[in-house]
Every structure is written in C-alpha cells, then in structure tokens.
C-alpha cells in the first residue's frame, strides 16, 4: 500500500526536497527521512532473511537423524537469537523513521502559487458589489485591479463603523471588557439579537448542506493525543490548541479534527466513497501566534461556533470535490449578500497538511480590506496515512489511502463581524440578511428585518 509522500521519498528524494523548499521549510527533513527509511528497509530485509532460514530449518528438524538434528536445533536457536537482536534494532529505527516521516509536509499541488507568506496569495475570482468608502479607494484597487480584476463597487461617502465598535458601542449587544475581566482577552459576552444571529447562521449552513446530501454530525469536542497528532502537525501547533491538564485530551480547534478521526484505523469500500459530512461544534483556539492582531471585537477569539464540511474521497475524485466544497461556501456567502473574493493560498502559507488551499475573504468596509472567513483544503493522503484510513478497491481488493478534504461552511462570530460592517446603515441599524429571516422567525424575540441599537438606560 503506497503513501504518496513515501513513494516520492523513495523514487525521487530531490523532487520531494523541492516541495519542502516551496514551503520555505528545511529540506534536511527529507535527508533524515530518506536515511532512516533506507536503514529500516535494510534491517527489515535482514530480519526477513533470518526468519526464512529459521523457518526452513525448523520445518526440517523432525526429519533429521542425530547428531545432525542437534546441530540444526542449535543453528535454529542461534538464528532466533540473531533475529531477536535485529528486531530490537529494527523497532528502534522504525520509531525514528516514523517520527521523521510525520515531520514531512504534504506534496504541493502544481497550481499553488510559490511564496513565503500571504502576500503571495493570488485572488482567482470576486463576487458582489462592495461598499467602498471614498478614503479606501486606492487600497481597494490594490486588492482588485492589481491582480487584473475590474470589480464594480458602490462608493460611500460616510465611513462605516468597525465591527468591534458597532457591536459594543453602537448596538450595545456585546461586552469584551467584562469578558476580559473574568476570562482574559479574546473572550466575549454576546446578547440578544447577536446571539439569535449566531444561531441563525449555524442553522442556515446546516440546512443548506444537509439539503445537498451531507450527513450531519455532532462530534466529540476533545480528542486523544494519538488522534490529534494524526489530524494536525501537533509538534508545531501544540501551542495553538488547548490541552486538558492531567488528561490525554485536547480541545478541538475545529470540527475538522473530530471528523478526520471518524474513520481512523478503518477500511472503507470504494463504492461507499465519497463520504460527505457536515459537523457543527464549538471551536477552541489559543491564537498564540496572533500577537496583538484583531484584539478588539470578535474576529479572532478563543472560542466560537463553526459549521464544517469534511469529505473522504477516492484520490481521482478529490480535486473536483475541493471545487464543490469551496462552491458550497460561496453559495452561503452569496446568500448572505456579503461581497467576497476567493484566494489561492501561497505555498509558504499552506500549513503542513494541505496540498492546496483556498480562502474565501469578505470585503470589510470599515477596514478597507478583504478578510478571511473560510478556509478550504485538500489534504490528499496526509491525514489518512497518519490516521490509517484506507479505501479498498473492488478490483483486486487493492488497499490505498483515501483523500480527505475540509472546508469551513460558516464560522459564526467571524461572519457576524462581516455582517456588522457590510450591512450597517447610517442610522446605526444593521439589515438582517434575507436568507436568515426564516431561521429567526422561530424565536419570538429575535429580530426580523433589522438589528437596532439597544437604548441606553437612564441613570
């Protein structure tokens, strides 16, 4: 059974180095894995040869006369002793080899732009008519026409209020100050209409995807170390996720983690593929690398709700399914009437699991920037190798690793920030997207057409 990265390591290690270099990672990772794999195969061959000789001798011993039988018994014992010693060495090398293999990132797809960071990301399409404040025209052009796109926009002469101020000081429906006192930075209290909006967004995404045939899943919110290290590069990202003290458990940063583990250590008949799931869960993130970015508001927070798409696929179908996943996300944001662009992520910004990644970024009028709302990845067989998830081909009962894909559908708090900036009005109200209204109607107190500022109570 072949794993694409191991196959390339053995067939063309120099080409695998080029893929590692595209990610601006140390190519000596390949040298180390290649050396250990070579040594592992050498020892494995020796162990197999000794085992074969031992089996031949053991089979023939009963047929031999003395003293030849005693000599052969001693020879078999000696072979067994040598084999046990070699197997011990083999296990040591095997552990080191596996550790080295798991450090290798995925093979970069040929359509991925090469560059060290997000400044090399390439927009591939735009949708909607953004509201652009007159003071942001130049930077809007930098994010559109620079890439050869002529995007129609609506010029506004009043500067929209940022989502953080809109939430706390205009609508007065959030409180990050009190949350900071009791829980720390990047936490929040949300109230009334914003909570209804959060729930409606989740219902909207769930309704849309289950209508398309995706199986709804409420997954575990915690995973064991063995599983979490199969889903992500845990050695690199251990400071980005929360560990439960005294327990072999980690809080998930996305339902992707639990959905990837759903078929861990299983074999899936090819006729059952693709398996399409939509998971809904809270997400917990340390945001350790965020520094002082987005400290205000609820754009980058430690906890939020998210609806996630996850697919198990045949390798020959995974690239078409990646387009389906990003298409599903685009349908959701079109329904919300939030102008966006889809971006092909640069090689240095992919993260180890992804062979290719798209981000969907909505226009944020108060910032004059497109900001990430959705991340969609094809991880090919990177996760499935680590989690031992295989497909079984009907013809010849051949086994191989499945391809897995994931994509955000809706991350509620981040999507709320986009709604607050894009759908605000000069009088301080926020127009509720039409597609959400039927999900709000089930609540007697939920907003229908507009979210209004809460009137300040008199002292």
Swiss-Prot record:
Enumerate the InterPro entries for this protein.
aa-tRNA-synt_IIb (IPR002314), aa-tRNA-synth_II (IPR006195), aa-tRNA-synth_II/BPL/LPL (IPR045864), Ser-tRNA-ligase_type_1 (IPR002317), Ser-tRNA-synth_1_N (IPR015866), SerRS_1_N_sf (IPR042103), SerRS_core (IPR033729), tRNA-bd_arm (IPR010978)
User: What one GO molecular function would you report for this record?
Assistant: serine-tRNA ligase activity
What is the protein's given name? Serine--tRNA ligase
Q: Which organism is it from?
A: Desulfurococcus amylolyticus (strain DSM 18924 / JCM 16383 / VKM B-2413 / 1221n) (Desulfurococcus kamchatkensis)
**Ribosomal protein recorded as keyword:** no
Name a single GO cellular component: cytoplasm
Under the subunit heading, UniProt states: Homodimer. The tRNA molecule binds across the dimer.
Q: Which CDD domains does this UniProt record tie to the protein?
A: SerRS_core
Residues bound to ATP? 285-287, 301, 372-375
Q: Could you say which protein family the record assigns here?
A: Belongs to the class-II aminoacyl-tRNA synthetase family. Type-1 seryl-tRNA synthetase subfamily.
This protein's major location comes to cytoplasm
Which cellular compartments is it found in? Cytoplasm
């Amino acid at each position: 059974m072949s794993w694409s990265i191991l196959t390339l390591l053995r067939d063309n290690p120099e080409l695998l180095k080029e893929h590692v270099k595209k990610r601006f990672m140390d190519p000596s990772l390949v040298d180390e894995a290649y050396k250990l794999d070579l040594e592992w195969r050498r020892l494995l061959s020796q162990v197999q040869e000794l085992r074969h000789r031992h089996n031949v001798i053991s089979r023939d011993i009963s047929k031999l006369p003395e003293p030849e039988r005693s000599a052969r018994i001693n020879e078999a014992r000696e072979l067994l002793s040598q084999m046990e010693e070699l197997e011990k060495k083999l296990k040591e090398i095997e552990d080191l080899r596996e550790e080295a293999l798991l450090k290798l990132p995925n093979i970069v797809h040929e359509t991925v732009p090469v560059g060290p960071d997000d400044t090399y990301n390439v927009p591939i399409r735009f949708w909607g008519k953004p509201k652009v404040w007159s003071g942001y025209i130049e930077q809007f052009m930098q994010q559109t026409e620079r890439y050869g796109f002529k995007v129609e926009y609506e010029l506004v002469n009043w500067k929209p209020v940022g989502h953080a101020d809109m939430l706390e000081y205009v609508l007065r429906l959030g409180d990050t100050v009190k949350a900071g006192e009791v829980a720390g930075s990047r936490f929040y209290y949300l109230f009334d209409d914003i909570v209804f909006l959060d729930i409606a967004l989740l219902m909207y995404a769930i309704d849309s995807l289950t209508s398309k045939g995706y199986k709804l899943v409420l997954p575990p919110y915690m995973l064991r170390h063995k599983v979490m290290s199969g889903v992500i590069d845990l050695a690199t990202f251990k400071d980005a996720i929360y560990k439960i003290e005294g327990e072999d458990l980690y809080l998930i940063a996305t339902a992707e983690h639990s959905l990837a583990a759903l078929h861990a250590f299983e074999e899936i008949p090819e006729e059952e593929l693709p398996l399409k799931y939509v998971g809904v869960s809270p997400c917990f993130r340390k945001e350790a690398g965020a520094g002082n970015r987005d400290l205000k508001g609820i754009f980058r927070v430690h906890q939020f709700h998210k609806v996630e798409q996850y697919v198990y696929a045949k390798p020959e179908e995974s690239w078409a399914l990646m387009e389906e996943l990003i298409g599903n996300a685009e349908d959701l944001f079109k329904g919300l009437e939030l102008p966006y662009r889809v971006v092909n992520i640069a090689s240095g910004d992919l993260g180890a699991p992804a062979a290719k990644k798209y981000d969907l970024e909505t226009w944020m009028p108060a910032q004059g920037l497109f900001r990430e709302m959705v991340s969609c990845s094809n991880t090919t067989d990177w996760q499935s190798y680590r989690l031992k998830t295989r497909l079984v081909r009907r013809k010849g009962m051949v086994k191989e690793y499945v391809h897995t894909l994931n994509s955000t559908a809706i991350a509620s708090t981040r999507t709320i920030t986009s709604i607050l900036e894009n759908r605000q009005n000069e009088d301080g109200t926020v127009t509720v997207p039409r597609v959400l209204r039927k999900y709000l109607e089930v609540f007697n107190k939920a907003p229908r057409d507009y979210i209004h500022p809460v009137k300040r109570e008199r002292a």
